[in-house]
Amino acid sequence: MNVLVLDLETTVDRFDGKIDGSPFNPKNKCVSAHYRWQGKDGVTNLVFNHNEKLISDSIEILRTALARADVLVAHNAKFDCLWLTEMGLTLPPLIRCTMINEYILSKGQRRPLSLKATAERRDVTRKRSDLVDDLFKGGTGFEEMPLGVVLEYAEADVISCAEIYEQQLEELSLTENQSLNSVVEFMNEMLVFLLEIERNGIKVDLDALEVVKLELQNEHALLSRRLRDIVESVMGDSPINLNSGRDMTKVVYSREVSDRQLHIDVWNIGLQPNGKPKYPPRMKKAEFAKAVRDTTKIAYKTDALCCSDCNGTGKIQKYKTLTRQKNGKKYRVAGEAYKNPSKCKTCAGLGAIYHPTGQIAGLRLNPLSPSFASVNGFKTDKGTIALLISQAKGKGNDIAVEFLEKISRLNALSTYLDSFVKGLETWTRKDGILHSSFNQCITATGRLSSSNPNFQNQPKRGFPVRKAVTSRFQGGMFYEFDFSSVEFRVAGAVSRDRQVIDDVLNDKDIHKQTASIIHQIPADQVTKDQRQSCKLHSFAPLFGSMGNGLAAHEKKYYDEFFVIYKDIGKYQQRLMNGVLRNGIVASPSGRQYFWPNVERLRNGRVTNATQIVNYPIQGLAADLVQLSCIRAYKAIKSAGLNSLLVLTVHDSICLDVYPGEEEQVKTIIYDAMTGVGDEAKTRWDYDFPLPLEIEATAGKNWFDQHDIVLT
């Protein structure tokens, strides 16, 4: 086989502190291409856009090389392939990305995957970053650097990549790594699908986005005002910053850290030598309560009195002192004022003196376990707030429920505005198309991540920013096809749990069952709101959660789950025991996850238990979704449709559907997604015993969608 190892150097556009190297930015150009044939010496250099090169090399030379190649090898190959396709070049039949290979061979261990880091780890020819780093920092691009420097730098990249690829092939040939070869093939096929959706991009209606932005900003302002009112009512005049963990501890838990170092020591806060967080201490209920009292003190409401020294400004104007002499005696007088006022020492720059009233401040909620401890007191992150809302409802603490629900919504709105609205505004090109960037090598499980913006981090339903995502075709529609409860089906499949299989085949409403157990009522009496509020618990045990820290009625569900689904519990125990024996967990699709230092705990579980039981399920679910993407891509191309694959988010595939192709698209995508079980047998020799259910919606935009019937 003819294996071509390639590296491209391109210009980048710098704006608003960002660096954009995308081929979709019209300001960017391919400076040069560099390649060599595997097994042969010498690197071919082609220069297209460089200040020292008055006559560009012919792109036809590169076209000929690509046509001759059976395999294209590159590090972060998707970047190079995007540039090649946007330059009008045809890719070889097979792509092999050495970054993807290194990710797979890392077996879930977090390692730096850059070419430089990989070369150093494998002790091959080093990337010559020293040649260009200072130039880059100074704002000099490849097109402006001395051409000799560019060529030396790029040649080292090509040689390094070729040597890495050879080592990876040797490693993949080892007996213990045989299953990884199918993952290499699969992930490099998925790379081609990602090329397709990144090139197609999504159509963004910037006018609609502006309307959504104003709506979100207005809601944010209203919530902020109401939260300030609540804080004032429970904290008195104490100045509170809702973005401060220290202040939020006062508001939510009515406590503040009394001795920071003692707090850190008692709660074992910090990082282990491997960079992972330390484990919280194990404590009985009485020990935990005493530790809370020992490390924190009660926060009290305050009354504020205007500081008389600075008249409430928090600043003191000081003057330079001048020395004068009269009749032989020296004396001092005030000179001109210093340029900047000084902070008032009396009030510490606050402008007021705060006197405790003796009345306990805050919402008086309780941390539920040692895992709630943080360096600034106790946690108030998204997951913790969800648990505290349940506690507040159980206590009938209505003001706490309102505060927590509103602060949770405020945080969500801030994310919507800062990440998504701003992201769409920043990265949508002048033609109205946004080309998001997808990464296969970030999550430990194999799930995709994306950036510019991160579509994988958006809510699954009711997300108003989706109103701005529409069809580019006159009369076109935006379609989304979504796997239903894929992780639950995967868990039932890998554990062969009879009850899961029966529930799936009988179309049982699992979320209604969850609410029935939590609220201790018959399933037919569960309300829509109760079902919705309990959905977050339904599949949490699949991913290693034991319900620790939850209210008693919610914790009951986690205990009951493993009574109902006994074989899932047995499967999880087999995984933990297997890791203790050999340090490896494998998924049916061939992925391997490595935990070298797992130990048995006193409760029968093991260290890293959450990840050990989570990764194989998440990994297989991710692979089934991505396999459906590959199948959809091949089918759409084979049918020669005008409709475009544009996104995959969570467990779904999104398309921009051309008018008149609706029925064809429905049939193709339905077959692609429901057929992954059969293809799993062909690819991975794995019998998937459950049908996969697909839900589909369509609309003029991604938000205003209606259900569509699939056959």
Question: Which ranges hold each PLM region?
Answer:
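Function-dense linear segments that define catalytic or interfacial modules
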Residues: 437-523
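Short, conserved charged micro-motifs
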Residues: 660-667
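Conserved catalytic core of nucleic-acid polymerases
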Residues: 199, 302, 306-318, 325, ...
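Short active-site loop/helix that positions an aromatic residue
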Residues: 78-89, 102-106, 249-256, 484-498, ...
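A common structural junction motif
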Residues: 671-683
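Conserved "right-hand" nucleotidyltransferase catalytic core of DNA-directed polymerases
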Residues: 1-16, 27, 32, 126, ...
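Conserved catalytic palm subdomain of right-hand nucleotidyl-transferase polymerases, strongest
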Residues: 5-6, 74-75, 96-99, 472-486, ...
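Active-site-proximal helix-loop-helix substrate-binding element of RNase H-like nuclease domains
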Residues: 28-31, 35-65, 69-174, 271-272, ...
